């Protein structure tokens, strides 16, 4: 298949592109390198440095003929969605609409979309199934939910003259190799690892009892690939998480332990909470198990060990 991976130089997208190349697909990657890096693009993929907000750039790719799109690109910082909401809006909604319009124009039959657990907001329903009402509490969550609805509403249009099959994945806290270690606004586990590698204190925003559901990158890729040609996944929205949660304080302890440090020696500090943060998140992955035959396979301790080994092997970069 000819498959476009948007955001394919980034953390999640590059792992998607790598698996697709390994599976024998012809892969095109487009990325603006705002957070991605060209060296993440797998050998064998055709790389275009460009932006999903640039429809002319995308048109050159779509016009060559595509069988599927893995739409992973987006503005991914919850904090930046508050400080620069126009960029969040332009990238997450505008970029997605560009992709959708070109899918229709060039009759691309398959689209998989990277949604987010932030669409649920501060729900008391834990673990959270997909049918839970979406009440996002951050601008980022709003744009991800709006883009998700654009995806599915487009596929459900009665005036389409071809079958446009879409699937969305509400991904929880994804971690693993190639995660940003130098971006203070993206990925708490990567932030903590970067802090320790640079000899900085680990900063916990809030009291540390808030919890997150951490899912290893290989498990995420497995789910996407399993859905690609699965007719039962067409039109579906699936949670992708481990089904377990850790408090942020527990996460810090795990990261310190992975560096053979105690909390005291690791200089753990606290700061006021930030806007838009969900209190607790935990995925109900029953639907993904049933429809995709998918199961998260990588235990947290194993995934953290793999991520730590990778993090200690890459050149240190100053925090952004």
Cite the ranges covered by each PLM segment:
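Residue-level signal for the nucleotide or nucleotide-sugar donor/cofactor binding architecture
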Residues: 53, 83, 91-94, 131, ...
């Amino acid at each position: 298949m000819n498959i476009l991976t948007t955001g394919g130089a980034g953390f999640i997208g590059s792992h998607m592109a790598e698996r697709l190349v390994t599976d024998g697909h012809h892969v095109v990657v487009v990325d603006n390198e705002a957070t991605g890096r060209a060296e993440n693009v797998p050998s064998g993929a055709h790389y275009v440095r460009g932006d999903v907000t640039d429809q002319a750039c995308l048109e050159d790719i779509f016009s060559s003929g595509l069988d599927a799109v893995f739409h992973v690109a987006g503005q991914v910082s919850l904090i930046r969605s508050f400080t620069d909401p126009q960029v969040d809006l332009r990238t997450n909604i505008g970029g997605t609409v560009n992709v959708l319009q070109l899918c229709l124009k060039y009759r691309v039959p398959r689209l998989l979309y990277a949604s987010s657990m932030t669409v649920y907001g501060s729900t008391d329903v834990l673990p959270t199934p997909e049918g839970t009402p979406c009440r996002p509490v951050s601008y980022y969550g709003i744009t991800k939910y709006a883009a998700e609805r654009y995806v599915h509403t487009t596929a459900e249009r009665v005036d389409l003259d071809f079958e446009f099959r879409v699937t969305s994945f509400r991904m929880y806290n994804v971690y693993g190799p190639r995660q940003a270690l130098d971006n203070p606004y993206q990925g708490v586990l990567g932030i903590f690892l970067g802090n320790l590698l640079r000899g900085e204190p680990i900063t916990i925003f809030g009291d540390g009892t808030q919890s997150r559901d951490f899912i290893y990158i290989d498990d995420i890729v497995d789910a996407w690939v399993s859905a690609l040609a699965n007719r039962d996944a067409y039109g579906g929205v699936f949670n992708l998480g481990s089904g377990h949660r850790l408090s942020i304080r527990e996460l810090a302890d795990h990261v310190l332990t992975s560096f053979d440090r105690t909390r005291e020696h690791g200089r753990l500090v606290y700061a006021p909470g930030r806007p838009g943060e969900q209190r607790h998140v935990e995925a109900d992955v029953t639907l993904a198990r049933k429809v995709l035959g998918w199961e998260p396979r990588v235990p947290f301790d194993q995934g953290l060990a793999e991520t730590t080994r990778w993090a200690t092997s890459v050149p240190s970069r100053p925090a952004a």
